[in-house]
Swiss-Prot record:
InterPro entries: Methylgl_synth, Methylglyoxal_synth_AS, MGS-like_dom, MGS-like_dom_sf
Top-level EC class: lyase
Protein name: Methylglyoxal synthase
Cysteines engaged in disulfide bonds, as pairs: none
Keyword field: Lyase
Amino-acid positions noted as binding substrate in the UniProt annotation, renumbered to this chain: 19, 23, 45-48, 65-66, 98
PANTHER family assigned: METHYLGLYOXAL SYNTHASE (PTHR30492:SF0)
HAMAP family listed in its UniProt record: Methylglyoxal_synth
Function comment: Catalyzes the formation of methylglyoxal from dihydroxyacetone phosphate.
Active site, per annotation: 71 (proton donor/acceptor)
Length: 152
């Protein structure tokens, strides 16, 4: 696959998602890092986003609840280059009805080369990185090149 460069701005577009058993952890993490997060643009699935917004006062653009299509909405934003970082506290010990959506979301984050945190430690590493508050170039698939090759 041919690659091209996409520049992430200093203010990142961050998606926040948590499965039910992980919402408390993501909420506590959001409170702990509120001063950092307020410098960025936050997106979240419905329940998670409303909890974070109500408990922290942070501005959050809320999608639908995960099982109702919110994971897919976030995935679409990733594919469009509109999400720079995915913080996704998922529960590896419990299956959810929308497991295929979860797998698709993680696949898209990998395809489009965005940083992904799936637990407290990895989320802390991401926000403590000097790159978190800088403009950063990343390599992403060159979709136009891909499409042109498919249409020949």
């Amino acid at each position: 696959m041919e690659l091209t460069t996409r520049t992430m701005a200093t203010a990142k577009n961050i998606a926040l998602i948590a499965h039910d058993h992980c919402k408390t952890s993501l909420l506590a993490w959001s409170k702990k890092h509120k001063s950092l997060l307020k410098k960025h643009h936050l997106y979240a699935t419905g329940t998670t986003g409303n909890l974070i917004q109500n408990e922290t006062g942070l501005s959050v653009t809320n999608m639908l609840s995960g099982p109702m299509g919110g994971d897919q909405q976030i995935g679409s934003l990733i594919s469009e280059g509109k999400i720079d970082v995915l913080i996704f506290f998922w529960d590896p010990l419990n299956s959810v009805p929308h497991d295929p959506d979860v797998k698709a979301l993680l696949r898209l984050a990998t395809v489009w080369n965005i940083p992904v945190a799936t637990n407290l430690a990895s989320a802390d590493f991401i926000v403590s990185s000097p790159l978190f508050s800088e403009s950063v170039d990343i390599q992403v698939p060159d979709y136009q090149h891909y499409l042109n090759g498919r249409l020949k």
